[in-house]
Amino acid sequence: MTNQVAPPSARATPPDEPGPVPGRPLSVLLGLEGLALGGCPINALDLGRTLRGRGHRVEVFAIDEQVRTSLLPYAERSGFRPTLLPQRSSTHARARQIRRLMDASSSDVVHVFGPWLGRAATIAAAGRRPRSAVVTNWMMENVPYVPRRTPLVLGTRRLRDEAEGIQGRKVWLMEPPVDLEADAHDAAAGRRFRRELGVTDDEIAVVVVGRVDAHLKEEGLRHAIEAVVRLGHPALRLLVVGDGDAFDRIQSEADRANRQLGRRAVVLTGSRQDPRPAYDAADIALGMGGSALRALAHARPLVVLGQHGFAATYGPETRAYFDEQGFFGDTSEADPAGHLAAQLVDLLDPSRRAELAAYGRAEVQRYGLRAGAVQLEALYREELGALPGVLGREVDAALLSARAFVHETRFAARGWSGARPARQP
């Protein structure tokens, strides 16, 4: 069954192991799967900042890695100095690293935003002191390697329903949150961004803000570039704001498109530490996941991108679909670029854009940061109140450790070195 927000007293705490007193501030350790600036870590840090503002103690760790654009400046602006853990570690070594951080900060909860960290976090939280691990998976698919008894947070109803059917695991639904105050439309910032890139007032800026990665993102960006080429509209400009492992390939596609059109129709800006002016500059936004929600918060008309050519404009006709599936899709299209071009043609009408912008801004109010932080508080307290006894926790951790050892020994023979799977968007 789906976990609903329940009062802290809804489940009994074992009498020999008192959990946090209802209402007492919690100590929370947040774990980020890497250092690349992107939607998932930004959401995690925003939630951490909001929890801290509500009186809780929040610390952050992140897996160290070499990236084009680091999240560390954003973390520092949010009031955090993440502890960096080595990129390559076995599950047992990673669990020891996390446990040391939990001990140092007297953490009640370790909440990792990256499902591949779930095993290590679960092992780290086991022991005599009642502590809980929580895993958030905001990817667009369920994964098999999250421990079954570890509370799991998913971002769409479809994934939640699917995961609940897997051996009755505990699942919470929480869409990526939006900072409704910071992500409000600023017309002046948008004008400055447009001037910086040479976009005139009479041009139509189609803006994509997000990681330029091979995983999930590259396909949609290629279709967007081809759609601009096919339309050949002299006022249409495509601005791609972000960085990632597919950047050079997408830049090559942009160069090809610009030569074909005889103008600078497609521009890649690279990543920006503050991408909000890019949303403000958009006449039309393209995106998925958290980036799509931020576009709605900025009151921009939105076309949601996905896999296999999926593209759909957010509006009254599609709201039910996105409520169920999340801001993503994987419906195959025979002509992906042509399908996306048709969505853009509909949005060339200024009145249509204004109508959808107002609708999206009204709908996104449901995804505010404060509501997300309140939900996390309830989740943490409920899970801490429902922990098994010391013996049960240690047996679970021992079984999980044994399975992890067998799994990693098997994969080490095939050259696996402790690196993580695909990044969350």
Language-model features: where?
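A short helix/loop element that forms part of the nucleotide-sugar donor recognition site in Leloir-type
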Residues: R11-D16, A184-V199
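N-terminal strand-loop element at the rim of the active site
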Residues: P25, G31-G38, A44, R49-S89, ...
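Short His-centered aromatic/hydrophobic patch
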Residues: V112-G118, N137
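A short, well-ordered alpha-helix in the C-terminal region of glycosyltransferases
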Residues: R352-R366
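Donor nucleotide-sugar binding/catalytic pocket of nucleotide-sugar-dependent glycosyltransferases
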Residues: R149-A189
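Conserved donor-binding/catalytic core segment of Leloir-type glycosyltransferases
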Residues: V28-L29, V178, T200-E218, I225-V228, ...
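Nucleotide-activated donor-binding/catalytic signature segment of Leloir-type glycosyltransferases, i.e.
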Residues: G79-P82, I250-R272
